[in-house]
Amino acid sequence: MRADPGETPFEVTVPGGVIAGLRAGVGDPALLLHGGPGLSEHLGELADELRHAGLATSRFQQRGIAPSTVEGPFDVDRHVADAIAVLDFSGLQRVWVVGHSWGGYLALQLASRYPERIMGVLAIGTLGGVGDGGASSLGPNLLARIDDAGRAESAEIEQREEAGTASYADEVRSLELVWPAYFGDPAAAPPLPADIAISAACGEEAVASIEPDAERLERSLATCPVPIVFLHGDLDPLELEASARATAAVMPRAEVIELAGVGHFPWLERPGSAADALVKLVALAI
C-alpha cells in the first residue's frame, strides 16, 4: 500500500494483529474498500480524485496482505468487522462508503448490517448482491478477451492450482495474463502494478463465505434505506446486468450510472467519473 503525499498512516488493533491504513483530506468522511479478495490495496488514484471532490478519505489494506495482519479468518463476517473497527478507531459515526469490485460487495454488506453508519454507497465495478452477483461469468469473460497463447498458459496454471503445486509466481502470472482484459481497451491497459500482492488463502475463504449469506443479503438489501449509486462500465468483464443492475433493481434507493467504453477501473479509464457519480449519490441521499 503506497502512501500518497499528505496521507497519514494509521493502525487499528483487530483480532490477529492490526489493520494498516492511510487517511487524508478535509470534508465529509469516506471509507474506501479495495477489490480482491486477497489482493493488495490499490485505490490511491481513486482516493485522490475523491479528495479533490471534497471528501476526507480513509483507505486500508484488508487482512491477508501485509502490512495488515495475514492471519484469518478471512470470511465476509471478519472483513465487515474489520471495516467497522476502522470506523470506530477513527471516531467516524457515519461515512460515505466507496467500494470497488469485491470492495463494492463489502460496501453492500456494510449497508445491510449497519445502515445507521452509512450515509451512502458508491459501488464501482462491483460484485452484486443478488444471485451470484455476476461472479460466474467473470472468468469466462476475461479468458475470452485474451489470445490463445494466454488462454493456454492460464489453463496450465489452473491445472497446477488444482493439483496443489502452483507457486506464488503462478498466482501473479495468472493475474498478469488477464489483467488487460479488465479494461475497456485491453491494448491501452496499464501494466499490472509491480508491487501487487496476492493471498490465495484469503481469496478462497472469502469467496467461499459469500454463498451461505446470499439469501440474507438479498432480503436485507430489499429494505435497505441506504442510498447507493452503482458506477459500472459497459465493457466491464463483471457484467453490468448481473451485478449492478440486478442489485439496484431490488433496492429502494439505488441508481446505476453506465459508462460506455469503460471496463473495470472507471477512475483510471475515465478520470473524474467517480467524482461525478459522487454528486449523484449526494443528491440521492438528500
Feature-to-residue mapping (PLM):
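Flexible "cap/lid" loop of the alpha/beta hydrolase fold
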Residues: 121-161
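Active-site loop/oxyanion-hole signature of alpha/beta-hydrolase fold enzymes
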Residues: 59-98, 102, 276
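Conserved alpha/beta-hydrolase "acid-adjacent" motif
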Residues: 237-243
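Alpha/beta-hydrolase
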Residues: 154-219, 225-226
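Conserved HGGG/HGGXW glycine-rich cap/lid loop of the alpha/beta-hydrolase fold
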Residues: 10, 15-69
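Catalytic active-site module of serine/aspartate enzymes centered on a nucleophile-bearing elbow/loop
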Residues: 254-286
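Short beta-strand/loop motif that positions the catalytic acidic residue
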Residues: 224, 230-232
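Conserved hydrolase catalytic core segment
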Residues: 93-137
